[in-house]
Amino acid sequence: MLDNKFFRKISADVVMNYRKHIFDPAGGGSKAKQVDGKSYPSYSPNYKKSTGNLKVNGKPQHKKFKSSNAPVLTGDLLRDYGFQKYMTNGFSLGFKTEGAKVKRLAELGRVLSSERIPIPKSVAKFILLEANKYVMKELNKIKGGTFNV
């Protein structure tokens, strides 16, 4: 019942919801959470001090996130997460080029995604709600049938 049309419809919203949970771009990281829903641990005072005037690959620290614990330095990691491809039974999302950063952040206790928890519960709940709406809409198109769901 969940077809390619459904997955194409929700993929952009799933990416947006993931970014909102993990990075909180609108709030500058103030409400950002790890994939398991826990707050990010504080950075060490030395790290915070060193990032003040830091440039990575010629890019300065993202000013909006300067005072947050969200894993955003230049914004590259935030922008890297996205849709990868459609498959017959869904779609894949992930970090296209910044996977090593994600792994290193996990080693430091800042988990953005894991094998056990690939997406936050809030994103999974969003997908389930959208799937339910889509299935009901598709079933309503079929008149006079009996369904045991």
Annotated model-derived regions:
Residues 1-149:
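Short, Lys/Arg-rich flexible segments
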